[in-house]
Amino acid sequence: MKNINPTHTQAWKSLEAHKAELSNTTIQDLFKQEKNRFDDYSLTFNNQILVDFSKNNINQTTLSHLRQLAQECALDSAKEAMFTGEKINRTENRAVLHTALRNRTNTPVLVDGKDVMPEVNAVLAKMKDFCQRIISGEWKGYTGKAITDVVNIGIGGSDLGPYMVTEALRPYKNHLNMHFVSNVDGTHIAETLKKVNPETTLFLVASKTFTTQETMTNAQSARDWLLKAAKDESAVAKHFAALSTNAKDVEKFGIDTNNMFEFWDWVGGRYSLWSAIGLSIALSIGFENFEALLNGAHEMDKHFRSAPIEQNIPTTLALVGLWNTNFLGAQTEAILPYDQYLHRFAAYFQQGNMESNGKYVDRDGNVINNYQTGPIIWGEPGTNGQHAFYQLIHQGTTLIPCDFIAPAQTHNPLADHHNKLLSNFFAQTEALAFGKTKEEVEAEFIKAGKSLDDVKNIVPFKVFTGNKPTNSILVQKITPFTLGALIAMYEHKIFVQGVIFNIFSFDQWGVELGKQLANRILPELTDSEKVASHDSSTNGLINQFKAWR
């Protein structure tokens, strides 16, 4: 992968000049200028996903310069480097091959000259067998009862992805009840254990190293809880499985290593739901549906790898997003799914994007000070968000580009709920793009029988400037296949931006310092002695904590 500072490219210079040319052009103007704007600025995937990016402040010249930027930053060779197992995570000397986990063609993928696909398929086969035994009731707990509840214990990628997907695909769930524990706050595990029965609960401990502090603390508490009821160490093997590579510690914990599901160092945590980390997904929706999830992602992988840049959905979203942040001044993006099942989608890609591209050092080790890398990602489902934070998106002083996501078909066709939901989905992007002028506000008042003299003081507050950029992503229906494609689409968008930003998107050194300091502080909390080994603020906080506990 080539190291290219994007600001040194001709395309970046062209974009700077183009920004000035477009500075007095609004989205409203662009729709007047281009009669076929929707057709020219929308793309479809598999006749199941429509991506409309027409409500952005871009024209064909913008897109031409952005595509040139991708080419000058060697995007095509970077894509091939990832797909073919090159060690593009250079700070950890690792390949980046979440795409191999969903490689449904079994085309060989080599890491250090070795094809990884036989091992990938072996773990999938093992997962399939395990799911069949649990779902069918063949697997019994320590009293001979079948499993009714599954508790996934993990954190970060070992929690956010599986939790998001199992929630998104609840219409496909079987009889098993799924629970997710991540926070080292004892409240999380305690409240979960109140809901389950030790005789019928299976715990999945998701930690590659089997040493992650939060995960192992929660796993140990779950083990203690089980043994308090079972009073026999042999019960652990009947109620625990591990998603790990540390066979020694897994066995020491009491888990049968036959029920240990491996994954590899070329699988990053935030890209791991496609691996054994997705076992909770497969248990929740059945292995066939898990395979459909993989199939959807694989189809998006093929599209991303082979579609020309003009038709390439992840690349287009990445380039438009980069334009909004680096040239129009946005520092944040909102992901707004109009589907309650997708209520964790924004949180999932908050990690996916911010942990990947939240970097201030480029691939040459230089501090980045003349362009913006990853944006702040956040969001909530519609229509809840409309009654919470949309006010600022519409009338605030901060530019917030938004992705609106909605299914055309609902899993719950109750009365006219879905039409009302989608009417809001369509209305919001229209309102954000076109706004409401002073003249329109005044006309409304006149129609309501008011005189302009009476309302002149209120008119400014009811004006909407519009010109707020949005993407509309319409999905035919949220299924395992389309969800897999949607997730992969966002993964590749993040990758493209990381390539152009000239950063390493697949490490996360930013999480390490806090961990190191916490390990230093933990022993200081075991007694009541005052501490003086930190700065005055940290000392004061620790000492007050000791006084109050």
Curated annotation (Swiss-Prot):
Enzyme Commission number, as recorded: 5.3.1.9
InterPro entries registered for this protein in UniProt: G6P_Isomerase, G6P_Isomerase_C, Phosphoglucose_isomerase_CS, SIS_dom_sf, SIS_PGI_1, SIS_PGI_2
GO molecular function: carbohydrate derivative binding; glucose-6-phosphate isomerase activity; monosaccharide binding
Domain of life where this protein originates: Bacteria
Enzyme class: isomerase
Any Pfam family hit: PGI
One Gene Ontology biological process: gluconeogenesis
SUPFAM superfamilies to which the protein is assigned, alphabetical: SIS domain
Annotated NCBIfam families: PRK00179.1
Family to which this protein belongs: Belongs to the GPI family.
Name used for this protein in its record: Glucose-6-phosphate isomerase
Designated gene of the protein: pgi
